[in-house]
Amino acid sequence: MEILLHHDYLIQALSSTEGASVLELCQAGRCKGWVASTTIQALWQGLKKEERNKIKPLLTYLSVVTPTPRDLEDALQGNDFEEKLALTLSRSCGFDAVVSTMPEKFSNSEGLVLTADQVQSKIDGPVDSVNEVKLLDISASYHEILNDVEMEIADTTRTGQFILGSKVVQLEEKISEYCQTKYAVGVSSGTDALLISLMAAGIGEGDEVITSPYTFFATAGSIVRAGAKPVFADINDVTFNIKAEHIERCITPKTKAIMPVHLYGQCADMEPIMALAKKHNLIVIEDAAQSIGSEYKNKRAGSLGDMGCFSFFPAKNLGAFGDGGIVTTSSDDLYEKLKVLRVHGSKPKYYHKSIGGNFRLDALQAGVVKAKLSYLEGWTEKRRQNATVYNQLLQQNALTQYIQLPPEVFPRHVFNQYVIRAGSRRDELRTFLNENKIGCEIYYPLPLHVQECFGSLGYKKGDFPESEKAANETLALPISHEITQSQQEYIVEKIRRFFLGE
């Protein structure tokens, strides 16, 4: 439960022990407490001088939400500014309640304003029933990062440096440290991260790059855009990632690189892939768009190959408020090439050493990602906990005879998606879940080797049986860090009803 504490309640709780139980609940982690930044001044004015030293300790366990200019404008429509502002903030941020000593002061509250005793009863009482679960709600945790993000945006707006600049450099330094690499180069999208990496590796006309047919289009599309030919190798039936033994069969004198995909948040088996690359003198470009923070034998995704490519698409575990991406590397030579290529191949400006492109990351997106990066580990652990809850619930409900759970073969899996196999009944299950207002998605319904645009490659249905089987059987369930256990229980109960009719 997330609650906004009105200043009248806080003044009472800090002036006496009466009603302080809600603060104790917040301290104990039984609910998430918020205070409006405008409330701090009201507390300072409303408390006795000797009580003001109690304000600062509040901020060690309460979070601050800052009203936007629009929030303030809405609240000024009338004579009850403070009460209207509290309701406006609660509705825009999705808080469950405003805690006040005088709920009757709030007009049109629609039951949103509660006393301390009512909050206590609600937390101690039965959990509200669930009747809808979104696959992903990008805005659900916005209030959690609001202050940090708005500070970054304000800094950028005031400096007027919107393309590259210090914000991008700061993000690059933080990402390289996080991914355990020497360098990181911010670019315009995850797709462009793949393309610029191929260009930096000198891959082009007449070259072949081996990758998976079971992935997002950009993986193979970037290879074609670089002028090279994608060569597909089938996947492991458990991890959905490319297998080294299939890669080896595809290597020819024209092969210049391997592009393994760390699909759904789990790293591919990189040790044998890197051994093949060393044996045949091949570049390895990791498509880690879905796997920031994932690990393989204590090494982070993005540090395993020659370059690692990440996406900051808003739906990713670490997403911007628009498009963005980054390339990681520990190679001095590749780093210099990447920096030049992202600005049309120029060094210095207007003097072009090569044909590059406009692959620049803008400072606003860099600031947003930098602000969110400090939350990533906590969000990742929550996703991992959610995956454990799913596994336990599905096993307890005797559903593993009908569906295959996503195993964590290489710790640690970051669960960008929680993907189950539902066999021949996948499409029926998806329809049933949608009818019960449960968001779910098929990633990916048609493997790349049978996509119309790749017809000239000469592949046909049946060439990659594991990829085709995965495309026909897999289904992604809601797994974001915002999802609650009661929502997961609702989802599993509906899956149980689908398979067992109970």
Regions found by a protein language model. Name each.
Residues 286-321, 348-353:
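Conserved active-site segment immediately N-terminal to the catalytic lysine
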